Amino acid sequence: MAASGKLSTSRLPPLPTIREIIKLFRLQAAKQLSQNFLLDLRLTDKIVRKAGNLTNAYVYEVGPGPGGITRSILNADVTELLVVEKDTRFIPGLQMLSDAAPGKLRIVHGDVLTFKVEKAFSESLKRPWEDDPPNVHIIGNLPFSVSTPLIIKWLENISCRDGPFVYGRTQMTLTFQKEVAERLAANTGSKQRSRLSVMAQYLCNVRHIFTIPGQAFVPKPEVDVGVVHFTPLVQPKIEQPFKLVEKVVQNVFQFRRKYCHRGLGEELKRRKNKNEEKEEDDAENYRL
């Protein structure tokens, strides 16, 4: 579980507010990219506190946008903050933050879905999987359009211990639509229990730590936003390959709850038929 960290007294020098940055660089949220800006630094500070104690930490922030959470992370006295931003419009504002925190903020123009974060930090930060989590964190206010595919990608990385998890059990603090956040953290028997619940919880300790009202964002989304914290488990709850677990779970949840056994039955039947066909082929090859 994440410790409750305190923001450092070593803070950034006076800077324009995020709202002023948006006006200065004439930034507008791109609807096609599901962008929503979080301008209230009290909320961005809260997200950072819930990530744990970031003093001297190495942080990978995804989708920094105009830099609200970025400021809060830098104010937490991290050793290094790496931000990956796809939208070039935000780079000048982020560069202003970099100039205010010399040597601490590294800006990469790229796509979080393809960026190789396993090569971003020093090898010396790596810790054995069985140890406590490394001093590496992932934090992000994710655009709704990429949040689900990105967390599925990272869950697969956890199962393989690659990507951001080459450093060990890297913790993540991320935003999702409230409904998605509730599904990720839903307990067994909950009406919110879903494919995402199983996929996340068989690999991680998942906590929906708080909810941010939609009106806190600009532009205001139609839904509230949930902040979710993930800590990879030392031992997964299901000892099977990720793709197999994913396929079985997809089949289970493709039917309504009371009929979900049908999905599991169909997947088991399919796998049985496949095994029988393989056995027949092997027998035929042996006779030849």
PLM regions and their residue ranges:
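An accessory alpha-helical subdomain
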Residues: 223-226, 230-234, 238-287
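Catalytic cores of RNA-modifying enzymes
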Residues: 1-251
